[in-house]
Amino acid sequence: MITNTFIEKTKKKIARAEVVSFDIFDTLLLRPYLSPRDLFLHIEIDQCLEGFAFARREAELSARKKNPDKQEICYDDIYNEIEARFASAKKIELDWEFMVLQPNPEMKILWDYALELNKKVIVISDMYHSYEDLSQLLIKNKFHDFAHLYVSSRYGKTKKKGTLFEQVFHDLQVKPQDIVHIGDNKKGDFRTPAKLGMQAILYKQVTHQFLAINERARRFTEQNVSSLGKSILVAMLAMRWRKQTLQQERAQYWEDIGYAYAAPLAYGYSKWIETTAQQKQLDHLLFVARDGFLLQKAFEHFHCGEIKTSYVYAPRLLNLVYRLDYDKRNIEHVQTIVDFYSQKYADIRELRETQSLIKANDYHQFIQSHKHMFERYAKDMYADYHAYIDTIVDPQQNIGLIDSKTVAFTSQKMLEDVLQRPIQGLYWSTLLPYRTKKYAFDAFIPNNLNTLDPNVFTKNWKFVELLLSSPEFSIQGVSQEGRAIYKADPGTDEYVIKENYTQITKGAEIFYADLKAIFGQTPVYIEGQELVSWVNIFCDHPNSHDIKEMTKIKLAVDASHDRNMPLFSMQTSCLDFFKQPKVTLNALKNIAWRTPLQTLILHILRPIKVKRKPAKQLKISFFPYLKVQYFVWTFSLFKRLSCQLSLGDDKKHSS
């Protein structure tokens, strides 16, 4: 177990003290927000109280200005100043505090330690809430057996002024130096009590501790404007981090990935799915394997309505081989069909062995030459698939299909063909708009540019697909009984992913449990663009542990799942450079993450990249695989040739 130096040092001071005093907010109790004011924003959004967050802040300021003689105001003073239309929020806000406030496990250790030593434990808070409410909050969060609770709103005195501490000295007849006080406010919990002679311990808020050691979370909070979803997500990650640092066993890498990335993505996307499905009056949602696995789990965890869900198999491979729906010019399409049938049917395999098939047209002609055989087998398989879907879907239901990204709408096309009626597609986003006119669909993040925009699909869409996937091997078909027919000989890469995905699912389930424990069924409003930004920061800022773990991950890039490519990083050895120097270098150029040694080798062996463009343009890049572009110089040579010289990342846009 890693030693917590703060706890150990504080325990020593507690052991020598007569009285141990704790602050409440951000010390004993934690709010699941980066800022306490985000609680007001959450209430405003969830309760449809437009303008409440601002009005609540202004009411508190007004109450303090109107009571200059009071060191502290009370809760009633605030709501006496607020607009009448927000009067109902008085109870809502207090109920919300009871719902979301969580015990700080670090403080619970110190609290219990002080009680074990028979120290007098007291609580001192500068707060407008009442003594009764704060007492109940402490007891609800397992902070029992405190000897006294001092609340500024009750005494009209504060810690910041020192008067509330003086009240403690008087009541308990104790010397200041015999009291240890722990709190997070620099003035009220540290400077003032220290001046009075108390043993003051300044506690750094959990979110501040977390942001100090987690670069990605820090970048996320600093990026663009603050938002409710971002505030809640980072605060939850901070609270999980705090719990983990106090446990003897740390979570596995992929469990952490599931908690921090897979679960928030699935949650945010599934809440949009729920809202859209309700607007479209859909009765039954079909979550398409394998990208729908975690989405369905998230939906079922937090959906309170009566929309039915099913997990169905409808990958693009099945559309190719069951319906023979292919582009004859696409080598991947035609080769996948021929290879699939050759492996499954001996007569087609024998015919295939007599042919030399190289180009797309060769495969197409082979299919056409033996069309009757392909169509007969396809008809039988498609009949089984039809029977499988019929056991799931009621003819009277309004159907929604859930998938991640789509280009050709293959799953929707196949299911509409089976059901013989239109269905509603719900996607993260889509590509190629000319294909969308045939299908009814909505997108979580509309793709206005109709490209693989990193602000829509993230900087590595394969990573998102991995996060939303399932602990299954690739699917080669579906039996009439509805059982998935998996690939007969999955490779090592698929076994690694399946094993890791079990941990991803575990992390996601813990996130959902934490979310429910704090908020119940109250939505937390994590928006699509925030999720994209969060994933992109992961893609841009890996640490050495990320790079090491991701070297094991290769994902399929074809419909038949026969060709795999590294997701982020790869392992290389000196032998690789001697055996296959060109192949190894090309692979290094194309991966997103490299070790320092790999980067150095790439810079030494490929220091310059030259590109000749149409219209007499020449681009020369020095050290093009650096992560940063340091300069770009564009000039005209003899008024005939436009030249561009750059140092650093050649993929950056330049003028």
What are these regions (language model features)?
Residues 7-55:
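Active-site neighborhood of HAD-like aspartate-dependent phosphohydrolases
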Residues 9, 106-113, 136-137, 192, ...:
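A short acidic, amphipathic alpha-helical/loop segment
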Residues 47-59, 83-96, 142-151, 176-178, ...:
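Short, surface-exposed acidic
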Residues 72-123:
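Short, acidic loop-to-helix structural element flanking the phosphoryl-transfer center
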Residues 122-124, 128-178:
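Substrate-recognition "cap/lid" segment bordering the active-site pocket of phosphatases
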